[in-house]
From Swiss-Prot:
Annotated metabolic or biological route of this protein: Energy metabolism; oxidative phosphorylation
Protein name per UniProt: Cytochrome bd-I ubiquinol oxidase subunit X
Organism field: Escherichia coli (strain K12)
Gene Ontology cellular component list: cytochrome complex; membrane; outer membrane; plasma membrane
Family: Belongs to the cytochrome ubiquinol oxidase subunit X family.
Length: 37
């Protein structure tokens, strides 16, 4: 049953990375938008 934990951990790590990348991109775009005003 070790493979279940391995797959779960891998998916969790990948999803965390994607969410972090999207959050950073959102913050950067927000800063860029404020500079234009």
């Amino acid at each position: 049953m070790w493979y279940f934990a391995w797959i779960l951990g891998t998916l969790l790590a990948c999803s965390f990375g994607v969410i972090t990348a999207l959050a950073l991109e959102h913050v950067e775009s927000g800063k860029a938008g404020q500079e234009d005003i």
